[in-house]
Amino acid sequence: MAVRGEAAQDLAKPGLGGASPARVARGNHRHRGESSPSPRGSGCCWRALALQPLRRSPQLSSALCAGSLSVLLALLVRLVGGEVGGELEKSQEAAAEEEEEEGARGGVFPGPRGGAPGGGAQLSPWLQPAALLFSLLCAFFWMGLCLLRAGVRLPLAVALLAACCAGEALVQLSLGVGDGRLLSLPAAGVLLSCLGGATWLVLRLRLGVLMVAWTSVLRTVALVSLERFKVAWRPYLAYLAAVLGLLLARYAEQILPQCSGPAPPRERFGSQLSARTKEEIPGWKRRRRSSSVVAGEMSGCSGKSHRRTSLPCIPREQLMGHSEWDHKRGPRGSQSGTSITVDIAVMGEAHGLITDLLADPSLPPNVCTSLRAVSNLLSTQLTFQAIHKPRVNPTVTFSENYTCSDSEEGLEKDKQAISKRLRRSLPPGLLRRVSSTWTTTTSATGLPTLEPAPVRRDRSASIKPHEAPSPSAVNPDSWNAPGLTTLTKSRSFTSSYAVSAANHVKAKKQNRPGGLAKISPVPSPSSSPPQGSPASSPVSNSASQQFPESPEVTIKRGPGSHRALTYTQSAPDLSPQIPPPSVICSSCGRPYSQGNPADGPSERSGPAMLKPNRTDDTSQVTSDYETNNNSDSSDILQNEEEAECQREPQRKASACGTYTSQTMIFLDKPILAPEPLVMDNLDSIMDQLNTWNFPIFDLMENIGRKCGRILSQVSYRLFEDMGLFEAFKIPVREFMNYFHALEIGYRDIPYHNRIHATDVLHAVWYLTTQPIPGLPSVIGDHGSASDSDSDSGFTHGHMGYVFSKMYHVPDDKYGCLSGNIPALELMALYVAAAMHDYDHPGRTNAFLVATSAPQAVLYNDRSVLENHHAAAAWNLFMSRPEYNFLVNLDHVEFKHFRFLVIEAILATDLKKHFDFVAKFNAKVNDDVGIDWTNENDRLLVCQMCIKLADINGPAKCKELHLRWTEGIASEFYEQGDEEASLGLPISPFMDRSAPQLANLQESFISHIVGPLCHSYDSAGLMPGKWVDDSDDSGDTDDPEEEEEEAETPHEDEACESSIAPRKKSFKRRRIYCQITQHLLQNHMMWKKVIEEEQCLSGTENQSLDQVPLQHPSEQIQAIKEEEEEKGKPRAEETLAPQPDL
């Protein structure tokens, strides 16, 4: 039975014999019948075993059949030749004699014996051979038509006939047979050769036997019947009739379907006709076909060239749906040839393999991003749904994207699950907050609020919230914002703002539209001190005039004060085309008529100013740094400010010029830095740049409130101190032009103004240039790396290092970040700090999302302000050649620089604060730690640095901290007033009638600043200095630092008691950090204020139920004074245990 099963399987295999499925079925049925016992079972068994070789080999069976048929035909021809040979010779001799006699009588054509007398019977001898040849032609015609319909190719049949002719001639020449014999022996040889060739050429046995047998029979008939021709020519006449018959059959095959309708289904034989006819045949298409079948069909096509596919192609029918595809292809759809389908099982298996790979937490982020993209594509195709893909705009180029898209995508979207080791290394309080349900209300406070939107599985489900109730979940009424919409994690901005990076070196006008929409908040009301603060509140005695600018500074402009302003198209406009917009006034941001220069802008009404945007004005355009309702913006007062700072006459009032109708209108006179470029009366204050508590408000008073030059002046001093002008050959005028235009773009709002940008820039510079105890440096000599070649100016490849001229190292146990971060990355960090809040409207991301601001719609509610800051600042840089201070960077360096700046700006979004902190902690707690040779590690350090600099207010001294606190409180109250006017719920801590300033700052320090400083210091990156126990911190310059040292004697005693057994062999050294000391001091101050407020209100017993605060005795997760044994590396520090938040 096993042998019989193998025989059945062999018969089912496709081969040259091409056994049909019906034949295999009959064979299987016969085998199943033989399995039953019978009286003659032994004989049947032996016969089956004898026929096994024939059944297994289709080639052998076909050859046996062809050979048997050829032998029978040869014997038949030999028998006919032997019996009729003598009589035929006699009849031929008699016929020849009669023909000679008739010829002698004058006859032209011989006639048969017994012919009719007269001339009419002279043509009768040729009727018989003509009729015979016509019969042969018809026979071969029907045979050819049958073969063509069955799928046999025409060249194959013609080649068989050619082989027959060649075999015929070969036999005649080799045997030397004369013309008087019937060629019985050559006939047998020719038949054998023809049958063998046919067996080898023909694809299927049934068709091969039919063709060979039919050809042999017709050849034999022609050999016997054509008596009027020579014996040697008779086979060739038969072959000629065969060729003509096949050609007629091919012609009939072409014209028959057009006349009689669609033919039955058949396989293709290599012509365009077959492909065209096949499209018209109704039938079921196979959905799954192997690649070999597809390749066989494509290789057989000779009329149309197909591309060679290395991967399976998805047919358009599957992508668009059969009905839609039939509609789109129209009348020419039948000419598309054979459609190629995809094996869904293979795609499903590939999708499963990729899913298994994504489960591995050790994969790099860029690899995970690529695998996830492929998985999404496969899962989309596996659903078999109609997909409508929009066409890509051919005018958009994707060749200029930065080169770090993969790593950038991985850095932006932390979708990998946190490993067990990382979860063990993180404190429970941080794990409780690392969740998508936490967000922040502003980049200044970062207070956590509950997100009402559903959790996105693909973005934040990898980190589960802790089981402990969150502070916001304890008392939801305290937040007072049930309907506040918050944001989700954002993608990288750079993919939505594709700009050719090569244009940065072209000193010409760049005619390209910007992709920026406009934020139009209401004008800020006058600053007012917080109401309801107790008498002991640290901000109760502060004046509200500390933050610029007061409403009195705003000057009403006349009709002649309008200036034409650069505007860009905010978003792709789907509305019908309208006439070109009129010139935009920079004072009010609205178009005005050019016909009457004396007419001023339209008057603003109160209700119109409360609208966040205007959707009815489709022709309205904006600048990069100006909005609709920015009457208090700094660029409005540009003329007056320049007149006061530069002591130049005020610009004459003139009507706005006339411009041609173009897509873009550029300023004829851009905002340029006034003379002198560097103010010389600021040296006394600029000498204090190397102190953490830099008197930035005193600097603002010396420069002048209205000038707005504080950012450009400080930027120039810091770049000059670092040697970046020489390292990168930065032109000073272009540098000052851009930074002056950048600071003009900052609005005069209480907190997010140009003073805040300058403070963040100074903090970043301080954190990267000041000595850090125990930090190893990549290079040994810090001075040698900053030397630049006089020819090249800078080592291209951005791996050179620069150091501050104020960097004085007392010994080799100090280091600084600038010694580990290349100069190009360091300069990108400084530029990002100057750009990071450009054109900030004074409103939070949640407010823009809740009011459906154009920027929120443009950036899909994700990092709205951060994306706008980066886009607007870069658009300003690329708008004028006068701003291009990076002209000496090559193409690769510029793209990398732009990538680093954008990444640093997007990192300031506190919606992703906990993700950054968790990732940084995992890197620090790793065995390897921070690898300064790895660009991704350096980028992460720079992102943490700018994040700490952005929220450094609580880490400053008390005086500066209170100034910044008043500014953010005023900005919050302005947003609360606008929310109340718009009928929106007032956001937490923004209700002017119920101030909670102390709670705001205490929660901000506890949840945001404290853990961030702790993580930054645990990596050994916080500036400080070694302090011996015997020094008693007497060398500190700040008297507050001495007071702070005296306030914590118990901590020192605890540390000394814990290390008492080791004092005999080691000398202990402490690390003093001024930043952390200020943070601890301010945190304790706000907790005391909360206690005093509770005592005044008589709610001490209910404080824990109303406000989620810590006990005053608890310490925040910040840095205390650390100690280290002399001679040990900093990695071996023994820190006091800190409580988890």
UniProtKB/Swiss-Prot annotation:
Stored SUPFAM superfamilies: HD-domain/PDEase-like
Region feature Disordered, mapped onto this chain: 1-42, 90-111, 433-483, 505-654, 1024-1060, 1120-1141
Binding site for AMP: H752, D837, D950, Q1001
Entry-linked SMART domains: HDc
Location of Phosphothreonine modifications: T1036
Span list, region Interaction with SLFN12: 669-1141
Binding, Mg(2+): D837
Subcellular localization(s) per the UniProt record: Membrane; Cytoplasm, Cytosol
Cofactor annotation remark: Binds 2 divalent metal cations per subunit.
Classification via PROSITE patterns: PDEASE_I_1, PDEASE_I_2
InterPro entries membership: HD/PDEase_dom, PDEase_catalytic_dom, PDEase_catalytic_dom_sf, PDEase_CS
Compositional bias segments (type: Acidic residues): 1029-1046
Top-level EC class as recorded in UniProt: hydrolase
Phosphoserine found at: S310, S492, S520, S524, S533, S1033
Gene Ontology BP terms: apoptotic signaling pathway; cellular response to cGMP; cellular response to transforming growth factor beta stimulus; cGMP-mediated signaling; negative regulation of adenylate cyclase-activating G protein-coupled receptor signaling pathway; negative regulation of apoptotic process; negative regulation of cAMP/PKA signal transduction; negative regulation of vascular permeability
Compositionally biased region (Basic and acidic residues): 454-467
Activity modulation: Inhibited by cGMP.
Bias (Low complexity) ranges: 433-445, 533-544
Domain annotation PDEase: ranges: 674-1093
Record cross-link Glycyl lysine isopeptide (Lys-Gly) (interchain with G-Cter in SUMO2), residues: K1120
MF term (GO), any: 3',5'-cyclic-GMP phosphodiesterase activity
Enzyme Commission number(s) from the entry: 3.1.4.17
Catalytic activity field: a nucleoside 3',5'-cyclic phosphate + H2O = a nucleoside 5'-phosphate + H(+); 3',5'-cyclic AMP + H2O = AMP + H(+); 3',5'-cyclic GMP + H2O = GMP + H(+); 3',5'-cyclic UMP + H2O = UMP + H(+)
Biological function: Cyclic nucleotide phosphodiesterase with specificity for the second messengers cAMP and cGMP, which are key regulators of many important physiological processes. Also has activity toward cUMP. Independently of its catalytic activity it is part of an E2/17beta-estradiol-induced pro-apoptotic signaling pathway. E2 stabilizes the PDE3A/SLFN12 complex in the cytosol, promoting the dephosphorylation of SLFN12 and activating its pro-apoptotic ribosomal RNA/rRNA ribonuclease activity.
Name of the molecule in the record: cGMP-inhibited 3',5'-cyclic phosphodiesterase 3A
